[in-house]
Amino acid sequence: MTATLERRESASIWGRFCNWVTSTENRLNIGWFGVLMIPTLLTATSVFIIAFIAAPPVDIDGIREPVSGSLLYGNNIISGAIIPTSAAIGLHFYPIWEAASVDEWLYNGGPYELIVLHFLLGVACYMGREWELSYRLGMRPWIAVAYSAPVAAATAVFLIYPIGQGSFSDGMPLGISGTFNFMIVFQAEHNILMHPFHMLGVAGVFGGSLFSAMHGSLVTSSLIRETTENESANAGYKFGQEQETYNIVAAHGYFGRLIFQYASFNNSRSLHFFLAAWPVVGIWFTALGISTMAFNLNGFNFNQSVVDSQGRVINTWADIINRANLGMEVMHERNAHNFPLDLAAVEAPAVNG
Protein backbone atom coordinates (compact mmCIF):
# COMPACT_ATOMS: atom_id res chain seq x y z
CA MET A 1 0.00 0.00 0.00
CA THR A 2 2.85 2.37 0.84
CA ALA A 3 4.56 1.66 -2.49
CA THR A 4 1.31 2.37 -4.34
CA LEU A 5 0.95 5.76 -2.65
CA GLU A 6 4.56 6.66 -3.47
CA ARG A 7 4.00 5.79 -7.14
CA ARG A 8 0.90 7.95 -7.24
CA GLU A 9 2.75 10.85 -5.61
CA SER A 10 5.67 10.63 -8.05
CA ALA A 11 3.28 10.37 -10.97
CA SER A 12 1.44 13.45 -9.80
CA ILE A 13 4.72 15.38 -9.55
CA TRP A 14 5.56 14.40 -13.14
CA GLY A 15 2.03 15.25 -14.19
CA ARG A 16 2.26 18.68 -12.56
CA PHE A 17 5.58 19.26 -14.30
CA CYS A 18 4.05 18.29 -17.67
CA ASN A 19 1.09 20.58 -17.09
CA TRP A 20 3.40 23.45 -16.14
CA VAL A 21 5.64 22.95 -19.18
CA THR A 22 2.74 22.77 -21.64
CA SER A 23 0.57 25.47 -20.05
CA THR A 24 -0.27 28.52 -22.15
CA GLU A 25 -1.05 30.53 -19.00
CA ASN A 26 2.57 30.99 -17.87
CA ARG A 27 3.93 34.55 -18.08
CA LEU A 28 6.73 33.13 -20.25
CA ASN A 29 5.84 30.03 -22.21
CA ILE A 30 8.13 27.04 -21.64
CA GLY A 31 6.96 24.20 -23.89
CA TRP A 32 8.80 20.95 -24.49
CA PHE A 33 11.14 22.70 -26.91
CA GLY A 34 11.86 25.23 -24.17
CA VAL A 35 13.09 22.46 -21.87
CA LEU A 36 16.04 22.07 -24.26
CA MET A 37 16.18 25.69 -25.44
CA ILE A 38 16.68 27.26 -22.01
CA PRO A 39 19.81 25.33 -20.91
CA THR A 40 21.46 25.43 -24.35
CA LEU A 41 20.99 29.19 -24.83
CA LEU A 42 22.02 29.92 -21.23
CA THR A 43 25.18 27.86 -21.75
CA ALA A 44 26.00 29.55 -25.07
CA THR A 45 25.38 33.03 -23.63
CA SER A 46 27.39 32.43 -20.45
CA VAL A 47 30.41 30.98 -22.23
CA PHE A 48 30.25 33.75 -24.85
CA ILE A 49 30.36 36.48 -22.20
CA ILE A 50 33.20 34.85 -20.25
CA ALA A 51 35.25 34.09 -23.38
CA PHE A 52 34.68 37.54 -24.89
CA ILE A 53 36.05 39.09 -21.72
CA ALA A 54 38.86 36.72 -20.74
CA ALA A 55 39.69 33.96 -23.27
CA PRO A 56 43.40 33.68 -24.15
CA PRO A 57 44.57 33.90 -27.80
CA VAL A 58 43.61 31.03 -30.13
CA ASP A 59 45.77 29.26 -32.72
CA ILE A 60 43.06 29.60 -35.40
CA ASP A 61 45.21 28.58 -38.40
CA GLY A 62 46.95 25.72 -36.59
CA ILE A 63 50.40 27.20 -37.30
CA ARG A 64 51.32 28.25 -33.75
CA GLU A 65 50.36 31.89 -34.35
CA PRO A 66 47.62 32.63 -31.79
CA VAL A 67 45.11 35.39 -32.51
CA SER A 68 43.81 37.47 -29.60
CA GLY A 69 40.06 37.98 -29.35
CA SER A 70 39.11 38.91 -25.78
CA LEU A 71 38.90 42.25 -23.98
CA LEU A 72 41.52 41.35 -21.37
CA TYR A 73 43.99 40.54 -24.15
CA GLY A 74 43.93 43.99 -25.74
CA ASN A 75 40.70 44.12 -27.76
CA ASN A 76 37.77 46.51 -27.64
CA ILE A 77 34.09 45.88 -28.43
CA ILE A 78 34.69 46.38 -32.16
CA SER A 79 37.84 44.28 -32.58
CA GLY A 80 36.95 41.60 -30.02
CA ALA A 81 35.53 38.20 -30.96
CA ILE A 82 35.30 34.56 -30.01
CA ILE A 83 38.04 33.13 -32.25
CA PRO A 84 36.98 30.01 -34.22
CA THR A 85 38.30 26.59 -33.23
CA SER A 86 41.79 25.80 -34.56
CA ALA A 87 42.37 24.29 -37.99
CA ALA A 88 44.38 21.65 -36.11
CA ILE A 89 41.06 20.40 -34.68
CA GLY A 90 39.25 20.56 -38.03
CA LEU A 91 35.72 19.18 -37.73
CA HIS A 92 36.46 16.98 -34.72
CA PHE A 93 34.04 17.19 -31.81
CA TYR A 94 36.16 18.98 -29.21
CA PRO A 95 34.54 19.15 -25.76
CA ILE A 96 36.63 20.07 -22.71
CA TRP A 97 37.18 16.44 -21.73
CA GLU A 98 38.82 15.66 -25.09
CA ALA A 99 41.68 18.08 -24.37
CA ALA A 100 44.67 17.25 -22.19
CA SER A 101 44.04 20.39 -20.15
CA VAL A 102 41.79 23.44 -20.04
CA ASP A 103 44.74 25.53 -21.26
CA GLU A 104 45.04 23.33 -24.35
CA TRP A 105 41.28 23.53 -24.92
CA LEU A 106 41.39 27.32 -24.76
CA TYR A 107 44.49 27.53 -26.99
CA ASN A 108 42.73 25.43 -29.65
CA GLY A 109 39.56 27.52 -29.53
CA GLY A 110 37.27 25.05 -27.78
CA PRO A 111 34.85 27.76 -26.57
CA TYR A 112 33.86 28.61 -30.18
CA GLU A 113 32.64 25.09 -30.91
CA LEU A 114 30.86 24.91 -27.55
CA ILE A 115 29.08 28.23 -28.11
CA VAL A 116 28.13 27.57 -31.73
CA LEU A 117 26.73 24.07 -31.19
CA HIS A 118 24.72 25.11 -28.12
CA PHE A 119 23.52 28.26 -29.89
CA LEU A 120 22.32 26.38 -32.98
CA LEU A 121 20.48 23.84 -30.82
CA GLY A 122 18.96 26.71 -28.85
CA VAL A 123 17.69 28.74 -31.80
CA ALA A 124 16.31 25.59 -33.46
CA CYS A 125 14.41 24.87 -30.24
CA TYR A 126 13.23 28.48 -30.13
CA MET A 127 11.74 27.92 -33.58
CA GLY A 128 10.13 24.70 -32.37
CA ARG A 129 8.80 26.55 -29.32
CA GLU A 130 7.17 29.13 -31.60
CA TRP A 131 5.41 26.32 -33.44
CA GLU A 132 4.44 24.57 -30.19
CA LEU A 133 2.86 27.68 -28.66
CA SER A 134 1.03 28.45 -31.92
CA TYR A 135 -0.28 24.87 -31.99
CA ARG A 136 -1.52 24.98 -28.40
CA LEU A 137 -3.27 28.32 -29.00
CA GLY A 138 -4.93 27.08 -32.21
CA MET A 139 -2.93 29.46 -34.40
CA ARG A 140 -1.44 28.78 -37.80
CA PRO A 141 2.27 27.85 -37.95
CA TRP A 142 3.70 30.66 -40.07
CA ILE A 143 5.56 32.47 -37.26
CA ALA A 144 7.96 29.53 -36.93
CA VAL A 145 8.23 29.28 -40.72
CA ALA A 146 9.29 32.94 -40.93
CA TYR A 147 11.84 32.45 -38.14
CA SER A 148 13.34 29.55 -40.10
CA ALA A 149 15.05 32.11 -42.36
CA PRO A 150 17.48 33.52 -39.76
CA VAL A 151 17.90 30.01 -38.31
CA ALA A 152 18.91 28.76 -41.78
CA ALA A 153 21.32 31.69 -42.21
CA ALA A 154 22.99 31.07 -38.84
CA THR A 155 23.24 27.34 -39.53
CA ALA A 156 24.81 28.07 -42.91
CA VAL A 157 27.66 30.26 -41.60
CA PHE A 158 28.29 28.41 -38.33
CA LEU A 159 27.85 24.77 -39.37
CA ILE A 160 27.30 24.06 -43.08
CA TYR A 161 30.17 26.27 -44.28
CA PRO A 162 32.71 24.75 -41.85
CA ILE A 163 31.56 21.26 -42.88
CA GLY A 164 32.03 22.09 -46.56
CA GLN A 165 35.45 23.66 -45.96
CA GLY A 166 36.61 20.92 -43.63
CA SER A 167 37.22 22.89 -40.43
CA PHE A 168 35.44 24.97 -37.82
CA SER A 169 38.30 27.46 -38.23
CA ASP A 170 36.51 28.60 -41.42
CA GLY A 171 33.32 29.43 -39.49
CA MET A 172 32.29 33.02 -38.84
CA PRO A 173 34.03 34.55 -35.79
CA LEU A 174 31.67 35.72 -33.05
CA GLY A 175 32.45 39.43 -33.15
CA ILE A 176 32.01 42.59 -35.20
CA SER A 177 35.33 42.89 -37.05
CA GLY A 178 35.53 39.08 -37.20
CA THR A 179 32.24 39.07 -39.10
CA PHE A 180 33.66 41.60 -41.57
CA ASN A 181 36.80 39.49 -41.99
CA PHE A 182 34.60 36.45 -42.71
CA MET A 183 32.69 38.43 -45.36
CA ILE A 184 35.86 39.67 -47.05
CA VAL A 185 37.47 36.22 -47.15
CA PHE A 186 34.20 34.68 -48.35
CA GLN A 187 34.11 37.15 -51.24
CA ALA A 188 37.76 36.44 -52.08
CA GLU A 189 37.32 32.67 -52.15
CA HIS A 190 33.77 32.30 -53.46
CA ASN A 191 32.87 35.53 -55.32
CA ILE A 192 29.60 35.71 -53.38
CA LEU A 193 28.68 39.14 -54.80
CA MET A 194 28.32 37.47 -58.21
CA HIS A 195 26.08 34.68 -56.89
CA PRO A 196 22.37 35.01 -57.82
CA PHE A 197 21.21 33.68 -54.44
CA HIS A 198 23.12 36.43 -52.63
CA MET A 199 21.51 38.97 -54.96
CA LEU A 200 18.08 37.60 -53.99
CA GLY A 201 19.04 37.95 -50.33
CA VAL A 202 20.03 41.60 -50.84
CA ALA A 203 16.69 42.22 -52.55
CA GLY A 204 14.95 40.47 -49.65
CA VAL A 205 16.66 42.48 -46.89
CA PHE A 206 16.61 45.90 -48.57
CA GLY A 207 13.17 45.33 -50.06
CA GLY A 208 11.86 44.10 -46.71
CA SER A 209 13.19 47.25 -45.02
CA LEU A 210 11.53 49.43 -47.66
CA PHE A 211 8.19 47.61 -47.45
CA SER A 212 8.27 47.65 -43.64
CA ALA A 213 8.88 51.42 -43.60
CA MET A 214 6.19 51.99 -46.24
CA HIS A 215 3.64 49.87 -44.38
CA GLY A 216 4.34 51.36 -40.96
CA SER A 217 4.22 54.94 -42.21
CA LEU A 218 1.04 54.34 -44.24
CA VAL A 219 -0.76 52.72 -41.29
CA THR A 220 0.42 55.41 -38.88
CA SER A 221 -0.67 58.13 -41.31
CA SER A 222 -4.15 56.65 -41.75
CA LEU A 223 -5.00 55.95 -38.09
CA ILE A 224 -8.54 56.91 -37.17
CA ARG A 225 -8.26 59.57 -34.48
CA GLU A 226 -8.91 58.76 -30.81
CA THR A 227 -12.16 60.10 -29.38
CA THR A 228 -12.65 62.04 -26.16
CA GLU A 229 -15.22 61.28 -23.51
CA ASN A 230 -17.37 64.12 -24.84
CA GLU A 231 -17.98 62.64 -28.29
CA SER A 232 -19.31 59.44 -29.73
CA ALA A 233 -16.96 56.48 -30.12
CA ASN A 234 -18.28 56.30 -33.67
CA ALA A 235 -16.40 59.51 -34.43
CA GLY A 236 -13.02 57.82 -34.34
CA TYR A 237 -10.78 55.24 -32.73
CA LYS A 238 -11.30 54.40 -29.07
CA PHE A 239 -8.35 52.93 -27.18
CA GLY A 240 -8.63 49.16 -26.90
CA GLN A 241 -11.28 48.65 -29.58
CA GLU A 242 -11.35 45.27 -31.31
CA GLN A 243 -11.72 46.58 -34.85
CA GLU A 244 -8.82 47.52 -37.11
CA THR A 245 -7.19 50.71 -35.94
CA TYR A 246 -6.56 52.24 -39.33
CA ASN A 247 -8.48 52.91 -42.51
CA ILE A 248 -7.12 50.52 -45.14
CA VAL A 249 -9.32 52.12 -47.79
CA ALA A 250 -7.68 55.49 -47.17
CA ALA A 251 -4.20 53.93 -47.22
CA HIS A 252 -5.01 52.05 -50.43
CA GLY A 253 -6.34 55.20 -52.06
CA TYR A 254 -3.29 57.23 -51.07
CA PHE A 255 -0.73 54.71 -52.26
CA GLY A 256 -2.68 53.88 -55.40
CA ARG A 257 -2.55 57.54 -56.40
CA LEU A 258 1.08 57.92 -55.34
CA ILE A 259 2.28 55.08 -57.60
CA PHE A 260 -0.57 53.51 -59.57
CA GLN A 261 -3.71 51.64 -58.61
CA TYR A 262 -2.44 48.07 -58.84
CA ALA A 263 0.78 48.80 -56.91
CA SER A 264 -1.36 49.07 -53.78
CA PHE A 265 -2.91 46.19 -51.81
CA ASN A 266 -6.57 46.44 -50.95
CA ASN A 267 -6.58 43.10 -49.13
CA SER A 268 -5.02 43.05 -45.67
CA ARG A 269 -4.21 39.31 -45.76
CA SER A 270 -2.45 39.55 -49.11
CA LEU A 271 -0.51 42.58 -47.91
CA HIS A 272 0.76 40.95 -44.73
CA PHE A 273 1.60 37.69 -46.49
CA PHE A 274 3.72 39.70 -48.93
CA LEU A 275 5.42 41.61 -46.10
CA ALA A 276 6.37 38.33 -44.42
CA ALA A 277 7.25 36.29 -47.50
CA TRP A 278 9.52 38.80 -49.26
CA PRO A 279 12.39 38.97 -46.72
CA VAL A 280 11.94 35.34 -45.61
CA VAL A 281 12.31 33.92 -49.11
CA GLY A 282 15.26 36.24 -49.80
CA ILE A 283 17.11 35.09 -46.67
CA TRP A 284 16.27 31.44 -47.45
CA PHE A 285 18.01 31.88 -50.79
CA THR A 286 21.05 33.51 -49.20
CA ALA A 287 21.37 30.65 -46.71
CA LEU A 288 21.08 28.21 -49.62
CA GLY A 289 23.78 30.16 -51.48
CA ILE A 290 26.17 30.02 -48.50
CA SER A 291 25.47 26.29 -48.17
CA THR A 292 26.31 25.61 -51.84
CA MET A 293 29.38 27.85 -51.82
CA ALA A 294 30.50 25.90 -48.75
CA PHE A 295 31.23 23.08 -51.19
CA ASN A 296 32.87 25.51 -53.65
CA LEU A 297 30.00 25.92 -56.09
CA ASN A 298 30.86 29.60 -56.36
CA GLY A 299 29.48 32.81 -57.88
CA PHE A 300 29.60 33.58 -61.59
CA ASN A 301 33.01 34.04 -63.20
CA PHE A 302 32.95 36.56 -66.03
CA ASN A 303 36.68 37.28 -65.90
CA GLN A 304 38.18 38.42 -69.22
CA SER A 305 34.98 37.61 -71.08
CA VAL A 306 35.07 40.71 -73.32
CA VAL A 307 37.85 40.91 -75.94
CA ASP A 308 38.42 43.07 -79.01
CA SER A 309 39.00 41.83 -82.56
CA GLN A 310 42.70 41.33 -81.80
CA GLY A 311 41.98 39.16 -78.78
CA ARG A 312 42.98 41.84 -76.28
CA VAL A 313 40.98 41.86 -73.05
CA ILE A 314 38.64 44.78 -72.45
CA ASN A 315 38.12 44.90 -68.70
CA THR A 316 34.60 44.90 -67.27
CA TRP A 317 33.53 45.41 -63.68
CA ALA A 318 33.80 41.63 -63.29
CA ASP A 319 37.54 41.93 -63.94
CA ILE A 320 37.84 44.73 -61.38
CA ILE A 321 36.08 42.56 -58.79
CA ASN A 322 38.36 39.65 -59.70
CA ARG A 323 41.44 41.81 -59.08
CA ALA A 324 40.06 42.80 -55.68
CA ASN A 325 39.32 39.15 -54.91
CA LEU A 326 42.91 38.15 -55.67
CA GLY A 327 44.22 40.92 -53.44
CA MET A 328 42.02 39.87 -50.54
CA GLU A 329 42.86 36.21 -51.03
CA VAL A 330 46.64 36.62 -50.91
CA MET A 331 46.39 38.84 -47.82
CA HIS A 332 44.27 36.59 -45.60
CA GLU A 333 45.92 33.87 -43.48
CA ARG A 334 49.14 35.32 -44.84
CA ASN A 335 51.47 32.88 -43.05
CA ALA A 336 49.38 29.77 -43.62
CA HIS A 337 49.93 29.57 -47.40
CA ASN A 338 53.02 29.68 -49.56
CA PHE A 339 51.00 30.79 -52.57
CA PRO A 340 47.36 31.68 -53.31
CA LEU A 341 44.78 28.93 -53.62
CA ASP A 342 44.08 29.95 -57.22
CA LEU A 343 47.66 29.03 -58.13
CA ALA A 344 47.63 25.91 -55.96
CA ALA A 345 44.52 24.60 -57.71
CA VAL A 346 46.13 24.51 -61.16
CA GLU A 347 47.40 21.09 -62.22
CA ALA A 348 51.09 20.77 -62.91
CA PRO A 349 51.92 20.53 -66.63
CA ALA A 350 52.66 17.05 -67.93
CA VAL A 351 56.33 16.25 -68.46
CA ASN A 352 57.15 13.92 -71.37
CA GLY A 353 60.30 11.95 -71.06
Swiss-Prot record:
Residues binding Fe cation: H215, H272
Main localization (coarse): plastid
Residues that bind [CaMn4O5] cluster: D170, E189, H332, E333, D342, A344
Name used for this protein in its record: Photosystem II protein D1
Record organism: Dumortiera hirsuta (Liverwort)
Top-level EC class: oxidoreductase
Residues with N-acetylthreonine modification: T2
Post-translational events: Tyr-161 forms a radical intermediate that is referred to as redox-active TyrZ, YZ or Y-Z. C-terminally processed by CTPA; processing is essential to allow assembly of the oxygen-evolving complex and thus photosynthetic growth.
UniProt membrane topology term: Multi-pass membrane protein
Subcellular location: Plastid, Chloroplast thylakoid membrane
Ligand binding (chlorophyll a PD1): H198
Record note on cofactor: The D1/D2 heterodimer binds P680, chlorophylls that are the primary electron donor of PSII, and subsequent electron acceptors. It shares a non-heme iron and each subunit binds pheophytin, quinone, additional chlorophylls, carotenoids and lipids. D1 provides most of the ligands for the Mn4-Ca-O5 cluster of the oxygen-evolving complex (OEC). There is also a Cl(-1) ion associated with D1 and D2, which is required for oxygen evolution. The PSII complex binds additional chlorophylls, carotenoids and specific lipids.
Catalytic reaction(s) noted: 2 a plastoquinone + 4 hnu + 2 H2O = 2 a plastoquinol + O2
Residues marked Stabilizes free radical intermediate (site): H190
Domain of life: Eukaryota
Site (Tyrosine radical intermediate): Y161
Role according to the record: Photosystem II (PSII) is a light-driven water:plastoquinone oxidoreductase that uses light energy to abstract electrons from H(2)O, generating O(2) and a proton gradient subsequently used for ATP formation. It consists of a core antenna complex that captures photons, and an electron transfer chain that converts photonic excitation into a charge separation. The D1/D2 (PsbA/PsbD) reaction center heterodimer binds P680, the primary electron donor of PSII as well as several subsequent electron acceptors.
Subunit structure as annotated in this protein's UniProt entry: PSII is composed of 1 copy each of membrane proteins PsbA, PsbB, PsbC, PsbD, PsbE, PsbF, PsbH, PsbI, PsbJ, PsbK, PsbL, PsbM, PsbT, PsbX, PsbY, PsbZ, Psb30/Ycf12, at least 3 peripheral proteins of the oxygen-evolving complex and a large number of cofactors. It forms dimeric complexes.
GO cellular-component term (any): chloroplast thylakoid membrane
Residue ranges of the TM segments: 29-46, 118-133, 142-156, 197-218, 274-288
Family as reported in the entry's similarity comment: Belongs to the reaction center PufL/M/PsbA/D family.
Pfam families in the cross-refs: Photo_RC
Residues reported in the UniProt entry to bind chlorophyll a ChlzD1: H118
